[in-house]
Design a protein with these regions (language model features):
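Cytoplasmic-side transmembrane-helix entry/capping segments in multi-pass membrane proteins
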Residues: 33-41, 63-68, 89-100, 125, ...
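C-terminal ends of transmembrane helices
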Residues: 18-28, 51, 76-90, 135-145, ...
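N-terminal topogenic module of multi-pass integral membrane proteins
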Residues: 1-44, 48-59
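Structural signature of hydrophobic alpha-helical transmembrane segments
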Residues: 2-14, 40, 59-73, 117-130
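Ordered, amphipathic secondary-structure segments that act as subunit-interaction surfaces
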Residues: 72-111
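Helix-coil boundary and interhelical linker segments in multi-pass alpha-helical membrane proteins
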Residues: 1-5, 52-62, 107-121, 165-174
């Protein structure tokens, strides 16, 4: 795949994820340091986890100085944006997030595949690179990770990792098609509210609820109350 094209995707994903983390921090009313931490964690957390799992030195992060500076600038811009601009950004956030998911999932899968890892490791690398930063962000913000309970998200990263791990995509055109497909299906998940099956252990209000026992304390009747009031007079 053309590295210049892929770098463009990585840049867009870094901007989107850094600003997403910053917005979550501001929603939780964190200070500027908290905004900075969540922005950087969202942008680079998934890549760090991937590196640990597939044997790439974590110190390679420091060789990405341009992306780190880009993330810092993105967080700073998010922090000073007017509220009305932030509201506009959040309406298109899903698209940028889908672009970042696709770019980072493919990037992680290619890292693992080029190192000769089995398909299971390729899939894990794709998923961790694509969603790892968002999971860490939500945990640090005290939220349930949306990627695990919201519209279908991680499945598309798993799919990208599977097809790359199987060796079905070996050309630039094939990888670009995979990128477009992940973005398309992620946006379909958001638009049509596609969700994986789930089961709750909390009984619903209309389910089988055991009846509440009646109180054994006798309640005074209206006649007794009237008699008591008349004696008091």
């Amino acid at each position: 795949m053309d590295l210049h094209i892929f770098e463009v995707f990585s840049i867009i994903g870094t901007i989107a994820f850094a600003m997403s983390g910053a917005f979550v921090a501001m929603e939780e009313e964190y200070d500027i340091l908290g905004v900075l931490v969540l922005g950087l964690v969202t942008a680079f957390g998934g890549g760090i986890i991937r590196n640990v799992l597939i044997g790439i030195p974590v110190t390679t992060l420091w060789s990405q100085g341009s992306l780190i500076m880009l993330a810092l600038v993105s967080v700073a811009i998010a922090f000073i944006l007017p509220l009305k601009w932030i509201s506009h950004w959040k309406r298109t956030e899903a698209l940028f997030d889908a672009i970042g998911l696709a770019a980072f999932a493919i990037q992680g899968a290619l890292y693992a595949a080029n190192m000769g890892h089995p398909i299971s490791a390729v899939i894990v690398a794709a998923v961790m690179t694509g969603i790892g930063g968002g999971v860490i962000r939500d945990v640090l913000a005290g939220r349930k990770p949306l990627v695990l309970r919201d519209e279908i998200y991680a499945v598309w990263a798993m799919t990208a990792g599977f097809v790359i791990g199987m060796g079905w995509l070996t050309t630039n055109a094939g990888l670009l098609f995979c990128f477009a497909a992940v973005v398309f299906f992620r946006m379909c998940s958001v638009h049509y509210k596609w969700k994986l099956p789930r089961r709750s252990l909390v009984p619903s209000e209309t389910g089988n609820v055991s009846p509440q026992p009646e109180s054994i304390v006798p309640q005074p009747t209206s006649s007794v109350l009237q008699g008591t009031l008349s004696k008091g007079d």
